Regions:
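Active-site C-terminal subdomain of aminotransferase-like
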Residues: 60-165, 170-172
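Conserved C-terminal alpha-helix-loop-beta "cap" of PLP-dependent enzymes
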Residues: 142-214
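Conserved PLP-enzyme active-site core in the AAT-like
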Residues: 1-100, 162-166, 175, 179-182, ...
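Residue-level recognition of alpha-helix initiation/capping sites
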Residues: 13-14, 36, 127, 142, ...
Length: 214
């Protein structure tokens, strides 16, 4: 199989339709890791042939929480529904060096009494899923479109100002992420130092470009 990101890693929106057609003609399924907020405005992956779509629901009203926890979403075509795993059994080695099987991934990992549990991060994903779901219900389709459109408008306003300042924005099509090319005359390290002082978190690529997400 093949997995692609939508929008791409650097923020660019890529039209994968031709790629998906070629892959499907060779019997290769396509999975997509997609930003759920961008899907409010973009053509859904299922409409251009994706077989599996996954991603995080954090952007639907869930705080960053220093990186987690956040609930995920996982969607497949009808033909793959029975292949969605409830539990995945992995191969490992026991203490005597022999081959052993163990549960490597499952939807619920707590098999001890609540009083003895030291964490509840796995089963607590239901709370995050409920928060994201109710965020969508509360705002409704029109409200979500207004939110996503406002994010995109902010990104476009920032892009216009950056171009006005003489910088090159390399993402022709984007939702909320810009990739700015820094001239050789400017030091990326100086920009990074200034950004840290101002509490601004940029992404620094190795090709003299900087990523900015709204």
């Amino acid at each position: 199989g093949v997995m692609v990101q939508y929008p791409g890693d650097g923020g660019r929106i890529i039209d994968y339709r031709n790629l998906v057609q070629v892959l499907h003609s060779r019997g290769i399924p396509v999975a997509v890791a997609a930003d759920i907020m961008s899907l409010v405005l973009l053509v859904p992956p299922g409409q251009w042939g994706a077989d599996v779509v996954v991603g995080s629901t954090q952007r639907f009203g869930v705080p960053m929480n220093f990186g987690g926890p956040h609930a995920a979403y996982f969607a497949v075509r009808e033909m793959y529904k029975r292949y969605m795993p409830g539990r995945i059994i992995g191969v490992t080695v026991d203490r005597e060096g022999g081959k052993a099987l163990r549960m490597a991934l499952q939807t619920r990992e707590q098999h001890i009494k609540r009083e003895r549990a030291t964490s509840n991060i796995c089963t607590a994903q239901a709370l995050l899923a409920s928060m994201a779901g109710m965020y969508a219900v509360y705002h409704g389709p029109d409200g979500l479109k207004r939110i996503a459109s406002r994010i995109n408008q902010y990104a476009n306003a920032l892009r216009d100002k950056i171009i006005e300042l003489g910088f090159d924005e390399t993402n022709n099509d984007f939702f909320d992420t810009l990739r700015i090319r820094i001239p050789a005359s400017l030091s990326v390290e100086k920009i990074k130092s200034f950004a840290v002082e101002e509490g601004i978190n940029f992404r620094y690529f190795t090709d003299q470009t900087i990523g900015i997400s709204i």
